[in-house]
């Protein structure tokens, strides 16, 4: 696509000309790039893990800016930026970035909550019969009295479920 002439670079049908200053700066940059690999090779011998230290999590424990607790832990780098390490306080359960503002996360957020224990027992456990404090005779007597009151008010028959009237249509009239 790009071809270089003595006048400049031809790119997409348009010729871009060089000034004398631009060509000199390009030559200087090329010379600096040739010198930099030599410098990088010497620094690599001195500290082979210099690149790894930038990605490594911080070792220093930072106190929480809200509750001043030292029970904090490093979580991750915010937006994958090594200049913004994100921390979590176990005391007040808040996230914050070092040197940044404290996030307003409600207490209890940021941790997995345990599931509530399932109900093992049935009706007797709800009434407190698991302790043995409720007499079965009193419970039976209350149920019998309630049954008798309900049957008396409904003409001798207790309706536990609402009855839906069936409709059958023959010639437009209901049965």
UniProtKB/Swiss-Prot annotation:
Gene Ontology BP terms: regulation of DNA-templated transcription; seed coat development
Predominant subcellular localization, coarse grouping: nucleus
Keyword entries, A-Z: DNA-binding, Metal-binding, Nucleus, Transcription, Transcription regulation, Zinc, Zinc-finger
GO molecular function per UniProt: DNA-binding transcription factor activity; transcription cis-regulatory region binding; zinc ion binding
Region feature Disordered, mapped onto this chain: 29-57
InterPro entries documented for this protein: Dof, Znf_Dof
Compartments reported by the entry: Nucleus
Domain of life: Eukaryota
Upregulating conditions: By red or far-red light. Circadian-regulation. The transcript level rises progressively from dawn and decreases during the night.
Keyword Cell division: no
Positions of short motif Nuclear localization signal: 162-168
Zn-finger region bounds: Dof-type: 62-116
Biased composition (Polar residues): 37-52
Gene Ontology CC: nucleus
Role played: Transcription factor that binds specifically to a 5'-AA[AG]G-3' consensus core sequence. Acts as a negative regulator in the phytochrome-mediated light responses. Controls phyB-mediated end-of-day response and the phyA-mediated anthocyanin accumulation. Not involved in direct flowering time regulation.
Protein name as it appears in the record: Dof zinc finger protein DOF1.5
């Amino acid at each position: 696509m790009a071809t270089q002439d003595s006048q400049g670079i031809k790119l997409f049908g348009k010729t871009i000309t060089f000034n004398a200053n631009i060509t000199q700066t390009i030559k200087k940059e090329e010379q600096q790039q040739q010198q930099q690999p030599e410098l990088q090779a010497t620094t690599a011998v001195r500290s082979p893990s210099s690149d790894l230290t930038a990605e490594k999590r911080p070792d220093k424990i930072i106190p929480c800016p809200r509750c001043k607790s030292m029970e904090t832990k490093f979580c991750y780098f915010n937006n994958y930026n090594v200049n913004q390490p994100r921390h979590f306080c176990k005391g007040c359960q808040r996230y914050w970035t070092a040197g940044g503002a404290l996030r307003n996360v409600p207490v209890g957020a940021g941790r997995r909550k345990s599931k509530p224990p399932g109900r093992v027992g049935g009706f007797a456990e709800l009434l407190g019969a698991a302790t043995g404090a409720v007499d079965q005779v009193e419970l039976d007597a209350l149920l019998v009295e309630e049954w008798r009151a309900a049957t008396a008010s409904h003409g001798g028959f207790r309706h536990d479920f609402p009855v839906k009237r069936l409709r059958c249509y023959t010639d437009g009239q209901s049965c």
